UniProtKB/Swiss-Prot annotation:
Oligomeric form and interacting partners: Part of the 30S ribosomal subunit. Contacts proteins S4 and S8.
This protein's domain notes: The N-terminal domain interacts with the head of the 30S subunit; the C-terminal domain interacts with the body and contacts protein S4. The interaction surface between S4 and S5 is involved in control of translational fidelity.
NCBIfam families: rpsE_bact (TIGR01021)
The protein's name: Small ribosomal subunit protein uS5
Organism: Campylobacter curvus (strain 525.92)
Molecular functions (GO terms): rRNA binding; structural constituent of ribosome
Function: With S4 and S12 plays an important role in translational accuracy. Located at the back of the 30S subunit body where it stabilizes the conformation of the head with respect to the body.
PROSITE patterns the record matches: RIBOSOMAL_S5, S5_DSRBD
Gene name tied to this protein: rpsE
Family per record: Belongs to the universal ribosomal protein uS5 family.
InterPro entries in the record: Ribosomal_Su5_D2-typ_SF, Ribosomal_uS5, Ribosomal_uS5_bac-type, Ribosomal_uS5_C, Ribosomal_uS5_N, Ribosomal_uS5_N_CS, Ribsml_uS5_D2-typ_fold_subgr
GO cellular component annotations of the record: small ribosomal subunit
Domain named S5 DRBM: residues: 9-72
One of the protein's GO biological processes: translation
Length: 147
């Protein structure tokens, strides 16, 4: 496992969830955080954290993200070829785009693509739009790229 300089990376919170457990004395809340980290130069990762407080969940998610960093192969400002990946009920289609197109992506895919340093890409999220599964599908798709 490589060590990364955390100052070089940006963090984006994709999702914060709250779960409630009803107990005799009232309600107990717990929080989950889904975070994406990237250096806008080919390195990107995601992490998932759970805790009783939001800041703790975010810290755990960021630590987890640095354990799951992948290197994305770029061809100029886009990706080398089309790729389609299924993760659970989510499917994501990534297509290279000509220069000047910009990032056409939504939901959980956009922060990953931007933090990976991709500037021109077309994406389509098919099936479930559950942000955790879309993030995982996007990371899986980017890891399958071959230069």
């Amino acid at each position: 496992m490589e060590k990364y300089n955390r100052e070089e990376f940006e963090e984006v919170i994709v999702d914060i969830g709250r779960v409630t457990k009803v107990v005799k004395g009232g309600r107990r809340f717990r929080f989950t955080a889904l975070v994406v980290v990237g250096n806008r130069n080919g390195l990107v990762g995601f992490g998932y954290g759970k805790a009783k407080e939001v800041p703790d969940a975010m810290r755990k998610a960021i630590d987890d993200a640095f354990k799951n960093i992948i290197h994305v192969k770029l061809k100029g400002s886009t990706i080398p070829h089309d790729v389609e990946v299924k993760y659970n009920a989510s499917r994501i289609l990534l297509r290279p785009a000509s220069e000047g197109t910009g990032v056409i992506a939504g939901g959980g895919a956009r922060p990953i693509i931007e933090l990976a340093g991709i500037k021109d890409i077309l994406t389509k999220s098919l099936g479930s739009n559950n942000s955790a599964n879309v993030v995982r599908a996007t990371i899986k798709a980017l890891s399958l790229l071959k230069s």
